[in-house]
């Protein structure tokens, strides 16, 4: 490809090629979509996956038997009247169907029952017990297997084996990711 110089620039320059492309640009694209005609053959099956339905989608929420306990910690207000704890901030969720029995009514409350709160905080262990968050063993299992309860300098508690194994892979606390090493934790004697 030879290029000849002109006063206006090279004949086969990129700018000249761009100008010719723009001059012979594609025709305007039509704004309306044209339907494609499908030709059915004897052996082919056509499956419509567009899911265009004229009826609205209805989700039935009346038959959900699952219960979710949400623990919202609120500070008590001064001079606030003390309400009974059972149903103070609760509402009844029931079906609009009169035919269904009333024993299916569910109380929804912002307060968590004391026994559910204790189980939710530390698994199935009551509060005040020590367990390793990695292997989930309690104090008695840890001691029976010859391990120690250890605490990092950031205050997190583990069994000695789990923390040692964790520090082999990463020199950080498994809970808060603060940099620690094998010299930065100590046993706790209970």
Swiss-Prot record:
E3 ubiquitin-protein ligase which binds polysumoylated chains covalently attached to proteins and mediates 'Lys-6'-, 'Lys-11'-, 'Lys-48'- and 'Lys-63'-linked polyubiquitination of those substrates and their subsequent targeting to the proteasome for degradation. Regulates the degradation of several proteins including PML and the transcriptional activator PEA3. Involved in chromosome alignment and spindle assembly, it regulates the kinetochore CENPH-CENPI-CENPK complex by targeting polysumoylated CENPI to proteasomal degradation. Its main location: cytoplasm. InterPro entries: RING-HC_RNF4 (IPR043295), RNF4 (IPR047134), Znf_RING (IPR001841), Znf_RING/FYVE/PHD (IPR013083), Znf_RING_CS (IPR017907). This is E3 ubiquitin-protein ligase RNF4. GO terms for biological process: negative regulation of protein localization to chromatin; positive regulation of DNA-templated transcription; positive regulation of transcription by RNA polymerase II; proteasome-mediated ubiquitin-dependent protein catabolic process; protein autoubiquitination; protein K11-linked ubiquitination; protein K48-linked ubiquitination; protein K6-linked ubiquitination. A motif (SUMO interaction motif 2) lies at residues 46-49. Zn(2+) 2 binds at residues 154, 156, 173, 176. A zinc finger (RING-type) spans 132-177. Signal peptide: none annotated. It comes from Homo sapiens (Human). Residues 1-16 are annotated as: Required for ubiquitination activity.
């Amino acid at each position: 490809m030879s290029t000849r110089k002109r006063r206006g620039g090279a004949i086969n320059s990129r700018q000249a090629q761009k100008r010719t492309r723009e001059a012979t640009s594609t025709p305007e694209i039509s704004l309306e979509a044209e339907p494609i005609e499908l030709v059915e053959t004897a052996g082919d099956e056509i499956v419509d996956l567009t899911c265009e339905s004229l009826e609205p989608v209805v989700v039935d929420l009346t038959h959900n038997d699952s219960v979710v306990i949400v623990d919202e910690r609120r500070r008590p207000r001064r001079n606030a009247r003390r309400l009974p704890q059972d149903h103070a901030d609760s509402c009844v969720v029931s079906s609009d169907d009169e035919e269904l029995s009333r024993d299916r009514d569910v109380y929804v409350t912002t307060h968590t029952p004391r026994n559910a709160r204790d189980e939710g905080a530390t698994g199935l262990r009551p509060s005040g017990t020590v367990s390793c968050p990695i292997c989930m063993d309690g104090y008695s299992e840890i001691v029976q297997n010859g391990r120690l309860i250890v605490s990092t300098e950031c205050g997190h508690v583990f069994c000695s084996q789990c923390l040692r194994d964790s520090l082999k892979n990463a020199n950080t606390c498994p809970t808060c990711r603060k940099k620690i090493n094998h010299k930065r934790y100590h046993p706790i004697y209970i």
